Amino acid sequence: MEDEDECPELVPIKEKPSGPTAQIPVTIITGYLGAGKTTLLNYILTEQHNKRIAVILNEFGEGSALEKSLAVSQAGELYEEWLELRNGCLCCSVKDNGLKAIENLMEKKGKFDYILLETTGLADPGAVASMFWVDAELGSDVYLDGIVTVIDAKYGLQHLTEEKPEGLINEAARQIALADLTIINKTDLVHETELLKLRDTVRSINALVKILETQKSRVDLSEVLDLHSFDTKDGERLTKKLQLVKTSQPHLDKSMLTITFEVPGSVSEDLLNIFIQELLWEKTFKNKAGLPMTVIRLKGILSLQQKQKKVMLQGVHELYELEETPEFWADQEPRLNRLVFIGRNLDGEILKKEFISAVSNKDSVE
């Protein structure tokens, strides 16, 4: 796509065929300006991958021939609706959070296998992710598959060390904390020692995240799509993944890290809900320095009373859900609750103590 002659042309968009269609997975693509989000999306839009992918750009920037061709119609007027590309993909530019664009896309959803939603460089991907849980009408048509954060290998550490006013979270650290996958891009521009430091810093913030390293945003699409980060299809895989997560040691952003612990037994769902709500909504719990703990991402596999299947806990900011997985607790398998918290000012010792105290009332732990 380097040659402007190769830019896609506008073609009419046909309405979706009649008949039932499956839910469409949505992946949120986030990252700082210049990290390589647009390059990644351009690659996906133009690569032959036999998938019908709709890409929703938050806004078109200045620069590449592809962007210019997308933003201008055949009549030379600004084009902010839909553009279908030769490989079957679709592109859209919107000026809002993408909600209207997705609703419009649903009218044509029979044409697509996947939706990629770009956020602006400083946007909080958690706020965008939340709309998929809150909007029941959207929820029937789409589901959130994962959050992908693109990081500039050369300037990533600089963004992470940027000082913020008291009480504000570093945006780059937040984007990593929320990510299911991070793509460290432009690795050819840094030495291995710098790359190692960035890799360690990413891992210290989010011990759950998968890390890919690349140049020019070239990645295997199978690594980016179908992450199933928010569903319960594979409870066994999540259980094994959580077993490998360790409490991290803070690096650059000393207030942002991953905490994990496990507590044996089965707990009351009602008391568990109270604990989670006090943590996420009320921000009741404070660390040893007296600072309120802020959880940005929460995951867990839990054993609830009167339930024979393992229950998955997912949380983003103030929103959370508990959902049964297909996996049963085996007869001889010890029942336990394993939780992973990613956020700011977290103290694992205090969190575990508060969890046990909250769910231990009224003989709730069996």
Curated annotation (Swiss-Prot):
Source superkingdom: Eukaryota
Family annotation (InterPro entries): CobW-likC_sf (IPR036627), CobW-like_C (IPR011629), CobW/HypB/UreG_nucleotide-bd (IPR003495), P-loop_NTPase (IPR027417), Zinc-reg_GTPase_activator (IPR051316)
Extent of motif psi-PxLVp motif: 5-12
EC number(s) given by UniProt: 3.6.5.-
Reaction(s) the record says it catalyses: GTP + H2O = GDP + phosphate + H(+)
Keyword tags: Chaperone, GTP-binding, Hydrolase, Metal-binding, Nucleotide-binding, Nucleus, Zinc
Motif (CXCC motif): 89-92
Main location: nucleus
Residues given in the record as GTP binding sites: 31-38, 92-96, 185-188
Purpose: Zinc chaperone that directly transfers zinc cofactor to target metalloproteins, thereby activating them. Catalyzes zinc insertion into the active site of methionine aminopeptidase METAP1, which function to cleave the initiator methionine from polypeptides during or after protein translation. Mechanistically, the N-terminal psi-PxLVp motif binds to the C6H2-type zinc finger of inactive form of METAP1.
Protein name: Zinc-regulated GTPase metalloprotein activator 1
Lineage, opening ranks: Eukaryota, Metazoa, Chordata, Craniata, Vertebrata
